[in-house]
Amino acid sequence: MNKYIFCLTSFLVFINCRKTLSEGKNYTIETLMSNNRSSGGYFSKDASKLIYSSDKTGVFNIYEVDLSTKKEIQKTNSKEESYFVQGYSPLTNEIIYSADKGGNENSHLYLIRNEKSIDLTPGENTKASLLGWTKDQKNMYFQSNSRNPKYFDLYKINIETLETIMVFQNDLAYRYNSISENDRYLVFGLSISRNEDKMFLYDLKTKEKIEISNEKANYSGQGFDKNDENYFYTTNHEGEFYYLMSYNITSGKRDLVYKTNWDVRNSYLTKNNTYRVISINEDAKNRLVVVNNNDNSRVNFKGFEGLNIDSVYFSENEEVLRISARSSKSPGEIYTYNLTNDELNKITSNLNSKINPSNLAEGKVVRYESFDGLKIPAILYKPKNATKKEKVPALVWVHGGPGGQSRIGYRPLIQYLVNHGYAILAVNNRGSSGYGKTFYSLDDKNHGENDLKDCAWGKYWLQKQEYIDKEKIGIIGGSYGGFMTMAAMTFMPDEFKVGVNIYGVTNWVRTLRSIPAYWESSRNQLYKEMGNPFSKDSIRLYNISPLFHAQNIKNPIMVLQGANDPRVLQIESDEMVKAARSFGVYVEYLLFEDAGHGFAKKKQQIEGYSKILNFVDSKLK
């Protein structure tokens, strides 16, 4: 009340007050990062408990909820490393989780037994992940590159004795898709190029291998039915988008199961095959379809208006679901939903109670024409105070990849920047996934060229919006988006007033020559897309690498990097910063000693995001 009385005493103060109110509430980075993130959400065998991971302590730990009493217990107390829950052992009801060291991506699997963690997959510089359980539930399947860092072999471990046996030795960089319910069949894929995969059905008993992929296309395995009669997979060989097919193991007959005008991302059958879950990437939003196979009816979930359901996980009795849902204004939340009575319970409360969602920005899908007339999809986040009279600066946001996609959902850095007066245009440049295989392939061996022009034309589109200050537009991106940021500042030095490079590639020759050994299954695909750094392609890779053209940079840049990043090595950013500074460029450099390819800890995000805002405030706003 006093605020409004004071405003009335002075016309000038009234104007200032009105401006403040029109902007909505500005939140500090500490307030925004008091939001929590959660992942997982797995039922115990009797569906009485649910476990999930949350970073409410600053790093991800594991929490168990008694669904009858709603009582929650913190099961781990890590201070440094993030623990990501993988589920319960169906036999012993013990918790399995995954963790690496300092973001190095060498994740191991751990079992919590008698309140102590046991490393099930020990070894230096090795990586492992859970793949499923044997039919008798006594053994856990997992893949590990402990024998050869380039290849992941298939193992099973007895969950009681912890004895480990190799099931399949992998010498061709196969990627495991599925293991049959009867433990006899294994389906694995082999990446040939960005537009071609092979998929095989392997009989572990007879050692016979049959190719499921019958056309040159992309294939992704989606699992067996409960009787191991049919295998399900997605492919795009008869169109632009992925659709769901079935393959009869006995006859080899193929049938279409589900097709729409967007990519079917994944699909699975519940334990008794009562329901089929289908996830669709529909214009940068997730759409979930759950079909009751008894009558082919759709399951409609009540209480999720305004939210995108990202995923669902069924209890073994198929009566209760874990649902993960989010929106642009809300970080993902975990719910349980009872199909017998439509009872909905919210498990997490990840949005800080001090934040009013109405003060946050809603992502809106827009499209604009690029230099050659190609329609480029993007997501626009507009500040509350942006008007024709109160123009705002803007940033072009470039996603990772190559081949990634900016999607509708909550991103704390975007919300922080928009909340403090910056419009964000998250560009899905040519080469992005989700818009058909033709669009996806348009940047092959053309990276940093036409896709970069798409970003520049995104800037031109922003300049046409009446609420944008057309002289104050920068560019920001992480990983491949960090490369695009540096490419823009290097090869289009007059286009963007500032650039924020978050662990971006700046020397493609070195990066492609030093990719982690465990990426062997994707190496050929990456080389065919980007170019082989050990061939004449290295000339082009050199030419598009910002490091070697630092003399072109004119405007201020900021670089953020994790010292343990196995994908984009620290030396990439070190050398880029040194080169830019040698030509008199203003550079801010923030290095996290305990981070990898991404900043998992809240303290890293708070420091990094606040310094990004300070940088753009001082150099752009």
Kindly label every feature range from the protein language model.
Residues 1-4, 621:
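Positively charged n-region of N-terminal signal peptides that target proteins for export
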Residues 4-12:
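Sec-dependent N-terminal signal peptides
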Residues 21-26, 53-74, 100-119, 139, ...:
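Beta-propeller blade-edge and WD-like acidic-aromatic loop motif
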Residues 24, 33, 268-278, 290-302, ...:
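Extracellular/periplasmic ectodomains of large secreted or surface enzymes and adhesion receptors
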Residues 35-51, 80-98, 109, 124-143, ...:
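Conserved beta-propeller blade repeats
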Residues 349-471, 478-479, 506, 513-521:
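Cap/lid segment of the alpha/beta-hydrolase catalytic domain
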Residues 429-621:
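Active-site-proximal cap/loop segments of hydrolase catalytic domains
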